[in-house]
């Protein structure tokens, strides 16, 4: 699972999800990408599950980049605990996703294989996504 090695503050506020992503919204590494259409939290388990689905479909070919990292901690209180007595202990890590953020990128496979791999990955994620193709690659085919 993805998680930070060291953090300054173990516990964070929940925060609000508003606005769209201006940074991290373009294809920077690969020719094909999976882009978020709506906001949400992606847990480290979901990120890994989608990555596995992609790598299993492309088998040995291609290169995959994960463009997001779970750097926000979620806390949880033990089961059957009364309210109060402070915030719970850190339980899991999530990545905060804004609309327009590029989640995964892929290169080195043909368009049909890449689109199918990204579609399989999209089914593992709890938000709406779309598949994007680099313009010069789209013009070739």
Swiss-Prot record:
HAMAP family: Ribosomal_uL16
Gene behind this protein: rplP
Role of this protein: Binds 23S rRNA and is also seen to make contacts with the A and possibly P site tRNAs.
Subunit organization: Part of the 50S ribosomal subunit.
CDD domains xref list: Ribosomal_L16_L10e (cd01433)
Keywords: Ribonucleoprotein, Ribosomal protein, RNA-binding, rRNA-binding, tRNA-binding
GO cellular component: cytosolic large ribosomal subunit
Family statement: Belongs to the universal ribosomal protein uL16 family.
GO biological process: translation
GO MF annotations in UniProt: rRNA binding; structural constituent of ribosome; tRNA binding
Keyword Nucleus applies: no
Pfam families: Ribosomal_L16
Official protein name in the record: Large ribosomal subunit protein uL16
């Amino acid at each position: 699972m993805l998680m930070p090695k060291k953090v300054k503050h173990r516990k964070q506020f929940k925060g609000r999800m508003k606005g769209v992503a201006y940074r991290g919204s373009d294809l920077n590494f690969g020719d094909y990408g999976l882009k978020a259409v709506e906001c949400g939290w992606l847990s480290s388990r979901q990120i890994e599950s989608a990555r596995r689905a992609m790598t299993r479909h492309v088998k040995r070919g291609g290169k995959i980049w994960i463009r997001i990292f779970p750097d926000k901690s979620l806390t949880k209180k033990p089961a059957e605990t009364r309210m109060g007595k402070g915030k719970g202990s850190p339980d899991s890590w999530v990545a905060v996703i804004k609309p327009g953020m590029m989640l995964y990128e892929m290169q080195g496979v043909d368009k049909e294989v890449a689109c199918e791999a990204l579609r399989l990955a999209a089914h593992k994620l709890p938000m709406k996504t779309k598949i994007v193709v680099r313009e010069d690659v789209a013009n070739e085919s």
